[in-house]
């Protein structure tokens, strides 16, 4: 068993706290940008537009992630404490909400620049596992999105939460949604799937949703929501919708 007693604050600059969660976003975005610019983008026009697109992506991701968490997972709390919606540094981001925000931002940017939005969404899909990996590691450090009770040798006790031994579900997600997904999509990139805009995006939705759905069986449901239809979590139900969306999109791109 591992004892998790990490401090969510990485360090301080004067009186300003720099949290691991913030660093995860910064590192994930920076490495994703570098990966796209150095390895993925072959078209000169897209290369020139990509830096401006990143601004749209960041805004869409943060707004979508926060509003998604507010609406999907904790609406009553934030209606009672609306000012806390702005306190992103305290955690509380929905991946599915962030994804919706990124899709909207990509569509708006592409319309403005007269390009195919799937070109940018495919690049996001290929680089997103990098950010997901660091984000889940930050979740682990923050003792959030923790797993269900277990007696397995690699169980973790999140002492900031309780004294129960739990699955390190954040690390499961970092491995499958981060590392494995990165190499799976990289394989399809080498097969020239970028040639058909939207194919990589569809595959991302399919594989991410599969990984997320099954890992949710090891992750504790949000206490304010619990289990829903067929004893599934909200994350699983949303993953089913995203999987179906990805499968439908892939069928259109064949």
Language model features: what each stretch is:
Residues 1-254:
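A feature for loop-to-transmembrane-helix boundaries and adjacent hydrophobic helices
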């Amino acid at each position: 068993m591992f004892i998790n007693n990490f401090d969510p604050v990485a360090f301080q600059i004067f009186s300003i706290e720099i949290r691991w969660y913030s660093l995860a976003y910064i590192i994930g975005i920076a490495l994703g940008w570098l990966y796209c610019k150095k390895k993925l983008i072959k078209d000169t026009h897209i290369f020139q537009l990509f830096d401006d697109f990143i601004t749209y992506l960041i805004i869409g991701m943060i707004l979508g992630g926060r509003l998604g968490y507010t609406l999907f997972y904790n609406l009553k709390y934030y209606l009672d404490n609306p000012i806390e919606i702005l306190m992103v540094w305290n955690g509380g981001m929905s991946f599915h909400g962030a994804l919706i925000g990124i899709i909207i931002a990509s569509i708006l940017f592409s319309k403005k620049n007269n390009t195919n939005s799937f070109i940018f969404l495919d690049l996001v899909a290929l680089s997103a596992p990098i950010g997901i990996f660091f984000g889940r590691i930050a979740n682990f450090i923050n003792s959030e999105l923790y797993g269900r009770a277990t007696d397995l040798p690699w169980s973790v006790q999140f002492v900031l939460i309780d004294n129960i031994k739990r699955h390190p579900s954040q690390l499961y997600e970092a491995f499958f949604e981060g590392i494995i997904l990165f190499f799976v999509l990289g394989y399809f990139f080498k097969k020239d799937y970028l040639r058909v805009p939207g194919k990589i995006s569809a595959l991302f939705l399919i594989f991410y949703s599969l990984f997320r759905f099954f890992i949710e069986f090891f992750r504790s449901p949000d206490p304010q929501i619990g289990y829903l239809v067929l004893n599934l979590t909200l994350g699983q139900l949303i993953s089913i919708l995203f999987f179906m969306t990805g499968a439908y999109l892939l069928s259109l791109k064949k």
